[in-house]
Amino acid sequence: MEKSLHLEIVTPDRLVLSEKVDYVGAPGYEGEFGILPNHIPFLSALNIGSLYYKAGGKTHWIFVSGGFAEVSDNKVTVLAESAERAEDIDLERARKAKERAEQRLAQAKEKLDSARAQAALQRAMARMRVRGAA
């Protein structure tokens, strides 16, 4: 039996990560799910949040802004709208984005404006959580 997984995280712009890992935890729409080696194949939609993986006894965090995860043959492929490693997140930029989203949410007059502001707030807060977890 295989003792590791190959994790790839891809965005429309770039390959964010490609490495052997021991475990992957991801933010699914129905809640967080975990993947160990030899997991049954499946496909899941991802929510905005924290994806983490364990490799070499360390836990690593990555912000993902939605997308999909596919598990097959000890390979986890994440296709994300955007993804950032914890160490690459600009915390000050995330704080400013959070403040702007909160202001837009308070001033939203239409349902669409409110939904966009809520999504922006969720992304900013997830980035801040991931950066804090690093």
Swiss-Prot record:
Q: How does it sit in the membrane?
A: Peripheral membrane protein
Q: Which residue ranges run through the membrane?
A: none
User: Where in the cell does this protein reside?
Assistant: Cell inner membrane
| InterPro entries, A to Z | ATP_F1_dsu/esu_C_sf (IPR036794), ATP_synth_F1_dsu/esu (IPR001469), ATP_synth_F1_dsu/esu_N (IPR020546), ATP_synth_F1_esu_C (IPR020547), ATPsynth_dsu/esu_N (IPR036771)
Q: Which GO terms label this protein's molecular function in UniProt?
A: ATP binding; proton-transporting ATP synthase activity, rotational mechanism
Note the NCBIfam families from the entry.
Answer: ATP_synt_epsi, PRK00571.1-3, PRK13446.1
What is the annotated quaternary arrangement, including any partners?
A: F-type ATPases have 2 components, CF(1) - the catalytic core - and CF(0) - the membrane proton channel. CF(1) has five subunits: alpha(3), beta(3), gamma(1), delta(1), epsilon(1). CF(0) has three main subunits: a, b and c.
Function, as annotated, reads: Produces ATP from ADP in the presence of a proton gradient across the membrane.
Protein name, per record = ATP synthase epsilon chain
Please give the organism. Nitratidesulfovibrio vulgaris (strain DSM 19637 / Miyazaki F)
